Amino acid sequence: MASLASLYGFRMLGLFMVLPILALYMDDYPGFSPLLLGICLGIYGLTQAALQIPLGLLSDKIGRRPVIIGGLLVFVLGSLVAASAETSTGLIVGRAIQGAGAIASTLMALVSDLTSEENRTKAMATIGASIGMSFMLAMIVGPLIA
């Protein structure tokens, strides 16, 4: 279970690392505004939310692992697009692609599949803790590598 929590935490670290630095760099993108900053931050959650159920259903059909691996690859692709973006549009597209790598529901389903009922609460709490740890680490590491 620790490996799944680490996997989820690593993915969340990629999401959270941009939070403390994106506003600082918005002047580097022509025409970037507070509105576009909000869209850039929010588009990730929008695409993730829109794809949780379809990807969860897909994982019921083809298995959890292929969807998780595919989601991580999509997330990496989105990260590369966002990191190489020279315009606010490119940055927003990259963040949307990152969100399309939605694995949260599939990962939780895999945890549920792999744990007994008496250990499920502990497993879910471990994943929840990984989210908090990722957020804390991202607030420190993000600005250091920027």
What function would you assign to each model-found segment?
Residues 50-86:
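Conserved MFS/SLC helix-loop-helix module at the cytosolic interface between two early adjacent transmembrane helices
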Residues 9, 78, 89-102:
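Hydrophobic core of transmembrane alpha-helices in multi-pass small-molecule transporters
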Residues 45-53, 135-136:
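Residue-level signature of mid-helix packing/kink "hotspots" within the transmembrane helices
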Residues 23, 134-146:
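Small-residue (Gly/Pro/Ala) motifs that create kinks and tight helix-helix packing interfaces
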Residues 32-41, 124:
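Juxtamembrane helix-start elements in MFS-like secondary transporters
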Residues 94-130:
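Cytoplasmic helix-loop-helix junction between adjacent transmembrane helices
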